[in-house]
Amino acid sequence: MDDPAAPGPAGSPANDNGNGNGNGNGNGNGGKGKPAVPKGRETFRNQRRESEGSVDCPTLEFEYGDSDGHAAELSELYSYTENLEFTTNRKCFEEDFRTQVQDTKEWLELEEDAQKTYVMGLLDRLEVVSREKRLKVARAVLYLAQGTFGECDSEVDVLHWSRYNCFLLYQMGTFSAFLELLHMEIDNSQASSSALRKPAVSIADSTELRVLLSVMYLMVENIRLEREIDPCGWRTARETFRTELSFSTHNEEPFALLLFSMVTKFCSGLAPHFPIKKVLLLLWKVVMFTLGGFEHLQALKIQKRAELGLPPLAEDSIQVVKSMRAASPPSYTLDLGESQLAPPPSKLRGRRGSRRQLLTKQDSLDIYNERDLFKTEEPATEEEEESAADGERTLDGELDLLEQDPLVPPPPSQTPLSTDRVAFPKGLPWAPKVRQKDIEHFLEMSRNKFIGFTLGQDTDTLVGLPRPIHESVKTLKQHKYISIADIQIKNEEELEKCPLSLGEEVVPETPSEILYQGMLYSLPQYMIALLKILLAAAPTSKAKTDSINILADVLPEEMPVTVLQSMKLGIDVNRHKEIIVKSISALLLLLLKHFKLNHIYQFEYVSQHLVFANCIPLILKFFNQNILSYITAKNSISVLDYPCCTIQDLPELTTESLEAGDNSQFCWRNLFSCINLLRLLNKLTKWKHSRTMMLVVFKSAPILKRALKVKQAMLQLYVLKLLKIQTKYLGRQWRKSNMKTMSAIYQKVRHRMNDDWAYGNDIDARPWDFQAEECTLRANIEAFNSRRYDKPQDSEFSPVDNCLQSVLGQRLDLPEDFHYSYELWLEREVFSQPICWEELLQNH
């Protein structure tokens, strides 16, 4: 299998936002001949500057949700290079409207019946052979979907009429007509071969596809949006549209699978002209519309737990996070207080050696982590810097993700809330959870200690154990949490053991199930393609000749000639990449969450292919930049955003017009993308010790700690979760040097009562036999997919009658006159015909 996320050679990652890396990575390996003390002093200056800058970062008032505001989601469909086409669409509509409607009324003045008649005429005129005429009619439809902005006075009016027109277009069958046109354009070999011959693909090569995808996206996004004032007819149309997109109709695949096939075709190089940003945005919104967003997912989870007889959920995680407050990273002096009191590095190194000799009991991974690269609280010496550089070079050659400097500035640790905040909220935010496995493990250890033998999975017999153990078991059982996945795994084990007695499983035809069935056999290719595009869109990626070109639908035919035009194009390119990252991160997270709810092994199948395609190091590569700069980047030009650009005259291009407008303290889509990627990384590594070891091997701790500078509660929570799962592997010295981060983990992350996360004594922290864990999981996934989806046409368990007496005793319906000529029939049809017994057995 190809490794799509294999990055380029190690080096300082360039930030497409123009912000640089921001963490001192520009030093390289230079200055090796300088004394250690001046270099260390310069390092501390850099650390102070970075830490002081992060303290000034205000708390970001960000509300996480399925997507951004309606206007923002519509505006991200268009690149600034496409703005001239708004006028073209309007002209095409007005020319057609004047020839077809004899009345002098405008579109908004027509009665609904007249509007429907005109739309029917538009759809009839789409049925022409001429591509040029077809494109003009499609542009007229696009103008309607865009809100007939030529007749509107405000942005609110444009958005209102865009929704109205999209519902009208859907009710007249426009989506189905455009779906047929999309199939034609995908199969258009002439456009593909023309794009392949060109040295540089531009926005002109995808005109037809962009028009079709824009109409479909506007329809999906406008119809998906629910409002209380929507009329009953719109609500009915919404449910019909959702069903139409979710289920395969007329023996065709669900719409999402068509878009997935476009993504793989684009990544294979067969269709470089595909407007991939529009494809990904439409794919994300179709999946969200058909499967449901996060609120719908929570409702499905509650419903499924009730069906399985499980107790209700203690809390809604997203609602709990919304009530949490972000913590400030500690100041430089607090963070390095212990280091400033420490002895000189040379003496410290000597004392380390003597201390190791005195210790008789070590963490399970102390030997594994003898050369700890996370001791950033102490001044780094030249020898330690070279050791850090050697440690980075040990990474897999195809995964040179941590393009770090040998001197990694100490990331500011998380600190507990100040004394005036401790009272709010009272107690810890999460209810503790205990797994059945945890209770069994606790009782096994207790029985071994007190009575000398174990009772397997028996958690009820407490004979011979002291009273405190009884109380502990009672407390553990009070907080026992049984997940839907536990029930599904147990059912799967029973189906594997007793396939005949339990019979065939009844699988409900939910949208998630239908989508998984359609994706199953091409799922590895889909995941690889998405990660390839994500790698190309990451701000830390460098331009390489072998990387895919994701800018085909943003680059103009003629490159800019002035500085201002170049600035505008640079902003457009960065914005284009940010939107791609946003759509892929949200799409992958939605797929994982819905598949996990539908069946745990569907989730594990997608997860394994993401891991095999190097998703974990790719996300770490993404975060190996100045995340604060990425989140606060202003790659947008407000006056050029839809619908503003359709109402106001486009201003003359000046430096002021490029910088005017958006004064928000952060970029919503970039913060949304970062949280999605952290949640994705958390889902891939949770309870998977082999994957957690990947976080350790790729030196993720300093990368993740740098992200704590962003004062946003949800982002900090998922960073702390990822740090928590690997603390047991990082060694005692790392935990000692990062006590403020450990305190933040204790304060904000859910507790497992007997989880030994803060120490290395857990049996799961042993650094061996991780491959067996992944192999066992893969075998279970293959058994699940084979049992449920690889059903032979003739069941292996169908009854076969081999008894001669019963076969001869069967009564056959024969014609009344058959006995008159049965001897002739025997001669012709039996005795004179050669019998192929193999074929006969197969047919019967």
From Swiss-Prot:
Residues 1-18 have a biased composition (Low complexity). Keywords: Cytoplasm, Phosphoprotein. Coiled coil: none annotated. Its main location: cytoplasm. InterPro entries: Far11/STRP, Far11/STRP_C, Far11/STRP_N. Residues 1-58, 331-355, 370-422 are annotated as: Disordered. It is found in: Cytoplasm. GO terms for cellular component: cytoplasm; cytosol; FAR/SIN/STRIPAK complex. GO terms for biological process: cell migration; cytoskeleton organization; regulation of cell shape. Residues 19-33 have a biased composition (Gly residues). Belongs to the STRIP family. Plays a role in the regulation of cell morphology and cytoskeletal organization. Required in the control of cell shape. Calmodulin-binding scaffolding protein which is the center of the striatin-interacting phosphatase and kinase (STRIPAK) complexes. STRIPAK complexes have critical roles in protein (de)phosphorylation and are regulators of multiple signaling pathways including Hippo, MAPK, nuclear receptor and cytoskeleton remodeling. This is Striatin-interacting proteins 2.
